[in-house]
A protein has these predicted regions:
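SAM-dependent methyltransferase catalytic region
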Residues: 2-117
Length: 117
């Protein structure tokens, strides 16, 4: 499946990729791994990661997805401080129903209301 992705997805970090059923991140980590080949600094890593997005329904899968992203980065780079990278990961990879997601504002459209009376 990944063979069908355009090659510039890996080299042009302005290209956005969203996995609507991210699972534990197999596809996202593959794309990230290919992008990391063109990174030389933490800033490059953040740029490569900042246009990757994933939505997954199962919370435990999202936790594993985020760990897999960190592990993918650690296989290629020695990172001492993950704060900036974690900010991107926590913002871009979310637990939600893909069909109830507002992509323009990157937030859930599911409205829950609590009765006031």
């Amino acid at each position: 499946m990944c063979d069908n992705l355009p090659n510039d997805l890996y080299t042009d970090f302005s290209k956005t990729f969203c996995d609507p059923c991210a699972g534990i991140g197999n596809i996202i980590c593959y794309v990230l791994s290919e992008r990391l080949k063109y990174c030389k600094s933490e800033k490059d890593i953040i740029n490569a990661l900042s246009t990757l997005y994933g939505v997954e329904l199962m919370e435990d899968n999202v936790d594993e997805l985020k760990d897999n992203i960190r592990n993918t980065i650690c296989l290629k780079f020695e990172i001492n401080n993950f704060d900036n990278i974690n900010n991107v990961i926590n913002n871009n990879f979310v637990c939600s129903d893909f069909f109830e997601w507002d992509f323009e504002n990157w937030r859930s459209t599911k409205i829950t209301s609590n009765a006031l009376f």
